[in-house]
Amino acid sequence: MTNNLSGYRNKFVRVKTSKKRTVSSSNWLRRQLNDPYVAKARMDGFRSRAAYKLLEIHEKFKLFTPNMKIVDLGAAPGGWSQVASKLIKASDNNLNNKIISIDVLEIEHVAGVEFVQKDFFEADTEELIIQALDGRADIVMSDMASNTIGHKATDHIRTLLLCEQAFEFALKVLKPSGHFIAKIFRGGAENELLYKVKREFKTVKHFKPSSSRSESTEIYLVALNKK
């Protein structure tokens, strides 16, 4: 099971304050050092703890199978692309599997992944992805989130806007019966988006993986079987 953390829960690590380190950065470092999923990701060879969120989503909904075409939006540092590559048994020589990953930040190569280093919101990016797909996608997935500022309402709206744009893109490239996965932050303004998604997909679920931090308002929108 992805949430088996036996052996990864270490003693609490304290972080000393420093004149060169802000309070927020000290808190982030303390959280990272004491997060068992961070340690597990390091041991399992994943680039981020977010990999376990996608693994849990797959365990719940059984989305990934071999011979799929997948788009990973906001892919850096590549944890979700790594998981997708493993689940569909992708390789650089298997043309039946295709993962197109996009981010403005560079990521190291992942087997079976074609990386597009572009800002998703630039005018020509969608066309580049569509050309790289050479067909329609089975899954569009997005773990994109805006840089949080600690104001929950603002963080909620900003990440919701990213999800909306990912959804509009998914409608253009998904094949019938394709799936859409995206992060949102709960906050009340998501209802209109959920209404739109439910019109386009047969089944729409909310899911909060156990690997998602308990204090976080993030949940994942899992939209199954595009109409």
From Swiss-Prot:
Presence of the UniProt keyword S-adenosyl-L-methionine in the record: yes
Active site: 183 (proton acceptor)
Record Pfam families: FtsJ (PF01728)
Reaction(s) catalysed by this chain's protein: uridine(2552) in 23S rRNA + S-adenosyl-L-methionine = 2'-O-methyluridine(2552) in 23S rRNA + S-adenosyl-L-homocysteine + H(+)
UniProt keyword annotations, A-Z: Cytoplasm, Methyltransferase, rRNA processing, S-adenosyl-L-methionine, Transferase
Subcellular location per the Swiss-Prot or TrEMBL entry: Cytoplasm
Binding site for S-adenosyl-L-methionine: 78, 80, 103, 119, 143
Methyltransferase listed as a keyword: yes
One Gene Ontology molecular-function label: rRNA (uridine-2'-O-)-methyltransferase activity
Cystine bridges: none
Entry-linked InterPro entries: RNA_methyltr_RlmE, RNA_MeTrfase_FtsJ_dom, rRNA-MeTfrase_E, SAM-dependent_MTases_sf
GO cellular component: cytoplasm
EC number: 2.1.1.166
Chief localisation class: cytoplasm
Role summary: Specifically methylates the uridine in position 2552 of 23S rRNA at the 2'-O position of the ribose in the fully assembled 50S ribosomal subunit.
PANTHER family: RIBOSOMAL RNA METHYLTRANSFERASE (PTHR10920), RRNA METHYLTRANSFERASE 2, MITOCHONDRIAL (PTHR10920:SF18)
Assigned protein family: Belongs to the class I-like SAM-binding methyltransferase superfamily. RNA methyltransferase RlmE family.
Name by which UniProt lists this protein: Ribosomal RNA large subunit methyltransferase E
Organism: Rickettsia africae (strain ESF-5)
Gene coding for it: rlmE
